[in-house]
Amino acid sequence: MLSRSLNKVVTSIKSSSIIRMSSATAAATSAPTANAANALKASKAPKKGKLQVSLKTPKGTKDWADSDMVIREAIFSTLSGLFKKHGGVTIDTPVFELREILAGKYGEDSKLIYNLEDQGGELCSLRYDLTVPFARYVAMNNIQSIKRYHIAKVYRRDQPAMTKGRMREFYQCDFDVAGTFESMVPDSECLSILVEGLTSLGIKDFKIKLNHRKILDGIFQIAGVKDEDVRKISSAVDKLDKSPWEAVKKEMTEEKGQSEETADKIGEYVKLNGSLKEIHAVLSADANITSNEKAKQGLDDIATLMKYTEAFDIDSFISFDLSLARGLDYYTGLIYEVVTSASAPPENASELKKKAKSAEDASEFVGVGSIAAGGRYDNLVNMFSEASGKKSTQIPCVGISFGVERIFSLIKQRINSSTTIKPTATQVFVMAFGGGKDWTGYLPERMKVTKQLWDAGIEAEYVYKAKANPRKQFDAAEKAGCHIAVILGKEEYLEGKLRVKRLGQEFADDDGELVSAADIVPIVQEKLSQIHEDGLNEVTRLIKGL
């Protein structure tokens, strides 16, 4: 039986420097009462030259570590693998852009852009999304056709709700297709990627809310909205996922200057939602829609799209929702957002917000919001080309964006009660057991065996100590979440033998199997293949909900 005795080691850590707060002097304490306040201030003030910092991250940001990073890396790996499968190539753009590049692209959300101080004569801002920088890149390099994916951080001065994945610094995972192709073909593939991506991450209870910018603009024309008012009315409609129609109508009439008749006409349409076939049939039977040029173009696109979504077998995930407006100014065709049951705020959200002790507390009573979104933007590249004095070039684009923080929050909620996530990718721990005055601990020998495993692509570790006791080695293996131990016994190793043992409570009484040291790599590979015959690691299994 292998030794399992526990040896406790207490390590004392001495600080190399001590920060002392200045105290009030005896003179100050004996001063008149009138000077007490000044003395108190002086006692709290840092000494000149002393650095004082707040050890915290800025509001709306956080450090990521341990099991959270394991989950996030699995999300990135899953999505990047999916993008590559669809022919995507990756690019990287600066985290900040010239302010003029971002200006006028985000409608009312432009106020959320982080502006930087003057940088040597250039006014810059942190990127708000990955779409506008991509369009700038396409225009700047005269690219005619590209499938690109980009996984990177973006920044917004939003009211954060950290536990819901609403942050000021967050990752987006984007896939975009630029170029002229058959109508609705790239659009339908982007929708298919949305479904593939979310289901591969174990998110199955979701709907893709879909609308068409031209249909929405046609509805506004039918209702009598002036062209110059379209965007602000669109931003009001976009609030229907968070506010009731009565509140949106009030905004239209009292704040946006629309008549009751116009608002009611808009309301007749934006309350419609259902399957693609259902809503397409309703709109096709509406003479006002079919006689409006813009709306008719959008309706024709939907008819084409339905053939392709059926081919990709994704119809059941899509809801044709005329209330979806998306506030960003650059969309020209299909628009879509992915929502789940967690997207909406709780029913008593407004009451909970009132009871909250602070704005930060109140922000927790919101929904996760959309977890992915996208749409077609055919004019953005040309807008940059013309503005820079280049030849006008119409490069149609369509794309999708996965919100990593919001997806992460959903996955974290789902697996919190599941098996503990392995903090590392380590599969095998190499140990050595022995004793006596001549016992060296076999540190170089452990390193040699570990190197053999590394060379075979097997994740392995060992304790960085010459004579580590058995308990400490088992503890290290348990902390790393290892499945297998390769043990160098003092006498067995001299005979060219190694012991391979499964780890875990159910194998506590199992001494393992003695094998030839020359065969250690294939034997370990065989043992690992038996642990998960489907080839999936624990994190992937948890994310997929298996």
UniProtKB/Swiss-Prot annotation:
Its EC number is 6.1.1.21. It is an enzyme of class 6 (ligase). GO terms for cellular component: cytoplasm; cytosol; mitochondrion. It catalyses: tRNA(His) + L-histidine + ATP = L-histidyl-tRNA(His) + AMP + diphosphate + H(+). One of its GO terms (biological process) is mitochondrial translation. The keyword Nucleotidyltransferase does not apply. Residues 1-20 form a transit peptide. L-histidine binds at residues 129-131, 156, 172, 176, 326, 330-331. InterPro entries: aa-tRNA-synth_II (IPR006195), aa-tRNA-synth_II/BPL/LPL (IPR045864), Anticodon-bd (IPR004154), Anticodon-bd_dom_sf (IPR036621), His-tRNA-ligase (IPR015807), HisRS-like_core (IPR041715), HisRS/HisZ (IPR004516), HisRS_anticodon (IPR033656). GO terms for molecular function: aminoacyl-tRNA ligase activity; ATP binding; histidine-tRNA ligase activity; mRNA binding; RNA binding; sequence-specific mRNA binding. Disruption phenotype: Lethal. PROSITE patterns: AA_TRNA_LIGASE_II (PS50862). It comes from the Eukaryota. Keywords: Aminoacyl-tRNA synthetase, ATP-binding, Cytoplasm, Ligase, Mitochondrion, Nucleotide-binding, Protein biosynthesis, Transit peptide. Belongs to the class-II aminoacyl-tRNA synthetase family. Catalyzes the aminoacylation of histidyl-tRNA in both the cytoplasm and the mitochondrion. Present with 26800 molecules/cell in log phase SD medium. This is Histidine--tRNA ligase, mitochondrial. It comes from Saccharomyces cerevisiae (strain ATCC 204508 / S288c). The lineage of its organism: Eukaryota, Fungi, Dikarya, Ascomycota, Saccharomycotina.
